[in-house]
């Protein structure tokens, strides 16, 4: 099951049914099934609080993914800062909806085992994001 929640922000204008189907389709491409996924859309202040409290990182970010996966079933809590998504969309001259969906699927790709911190991994993640974005009409 995939749930969409907010904390201190207005729910973004996403097509939940279509987005949920897309997430399941992308997960299946990696041989994964969707378990319990919770998206928590929040502000920069909230994501900074979560980053400090749970990861001991003192900076803003667009997404924090807590991985609760078991076997081929992906589960997790995904905090997304709508403030950072908006500023990234402006910085990279992307439509807000495309940037939001990029971040939504970024967390799923992490749960599917794709990393983006090591040498060459960022490029692999970006290619996976672009492949996934091609599967949804925005």
Curated annotation (Swiss-Prot):
Its EC number is 3.1.-.-. Single strand-specific metallo-endoribonuclease involved in late-stage 70S ribosome quality control and in maturation of the 3' terminus of the 16S rRNA. Binds 1 zinc ion. One of its GO terms (molecular function) is metalloendopeptidase activity. GO terms for cellular component: cytoplasm. Zn(2+) binds at residues 106, 110, 116. Belongs to the endoribonuclease YbeY family. It comes from the Bacteria. HAMAP family: Endoribonucl_YbeY (MF_00009). Keywords: Cytoplasm, Endonuclease, Hydrolase, Metal-binding, Nuclease, Ribosome biogenesis, rRNA processing, Zinc. GO terms for biological process: rRNA processing. Its cofactor is Zn(2+). It is found in: Cytoplasm. It holds the Pfam family YbeY. It comes from Phocaeicola vulgatus (strain ATCC 8482 / DSM 1447 / JCM 5826 / CCUG 4940 / NBRC 14291 / NCTC 11154). InterPro entries: MetalPrtase_cat_dom_sf_prd (IPR023091), YbeY (IPR002036). This is Endoribonuclease YbeY.
